[in-house]
Amino acid sequence: MAVQQNVKKGGREAGGDLIVGKHVYGNLYGVDEEKLWDEELLKDIVVEAARVANMNLVDIKTWKFTGFHGGVSVIALVLESHISIHTWPDYGYATVDVYTCGANSDPWKAFNYIVLKLKPRYYIVHYADRSSIPGYTESEKR
């Protein structure tokens, strides 16, 4: 059963016709295994990443998957979109995804904060501009 929850307006903003969508995502390699198993630490890192990036936290969920190839997943719903970390401690590997809608939050700050706290040996980061095209309407797709 799905539960609908009302949240305050203002998290997703449009500047005229342009919806500002910024997506920063990447892979972290050589992260300490203990950090990648620590569900509470990862949750705290995501909460603080949302704060430093000027995002409004709505809810956060964590899951731990035990055994070899297990790991931890942390997903934060923010008014602006989401932040997630998925870990594979046996490989010292994590993926990070930060997506925001609106001009007032900065996904780069959240991503960089997570990298700072997890201290990977190296990482690969990608950026996608997910903004709409000014003046483009649904009827023009047809």
From Swiss-Prot:
Cofactor(s) demanded: pyruvate
Pathway entry: Amine and polyamine biosynthesis; agmatine biosynthesis; agmatine from L-arginine: step 1/1
Enzyme class: lyase
Gene Ontology CC terms: cytosol
Modified sites of kind Pyruvic acid (Ser): S81
Free-text comment on the cofactor: Binds 1 pyruvoyl group covalently per subunit.
InterPro entries, per the entry: AdoMetDC_fam_prok (IPR003826), ArgDC (IPR027549), S-AdoMet_deCO2ase_core (IPR016067), S-AdoMet_deCOase_pro-enz (IPR017716)
This enzyme's EC code(s): 4.1.1.19
Domain of life per record: Archaea
Keywords: Autocatalytic cleavage, Decarboxylase, Lyase, Polyamine biosynthesis, Pyruvate, Schiff base, Zymogen
Cysteine disulfide partners in this protein: none
Pfam families the UniProt entry points to: AdoMet_dc (PF02675)
Post-translational modification: Is synthesized initially as an inactive proenzyme. Formation of the active enzyme involves a self-maturation process in which the active site pyruvoyl group is generated from an internal serine residue via an autocatalytic post-translational modification. Two non-identical subunits are generated from the proenzyme in this reaction, and the pyruvate is formed at the N-terminus of the alpha chain, which is derived from the carboxyl end of the proenzyme.
UniProt-annotated catalytic positions: S81 (schiff-base intermediate with substrate), H86 (proton acceptor), C101 (proton donor)
Purpose of the protein: Specifically catalyzes the decarboxylation of L-arginine to agmatine. Has no S-adenosylmethionine decarboxylase (AdoMetDC) activity.
Family from the record: Belongs to the prokaryotic AdoMetDC family. Type 1 subfamily.
Subunit structure: Heterooctamer of four alpha and four beta chains arranged as a tetramer of alpha/beta heterodimers.
Protein name from the UniProt record: Arginine decarboxylase proenzyme
Organism: Hyperthermus butylicus (strain DSM 5456 / JCM 9403 / PLM1-5)
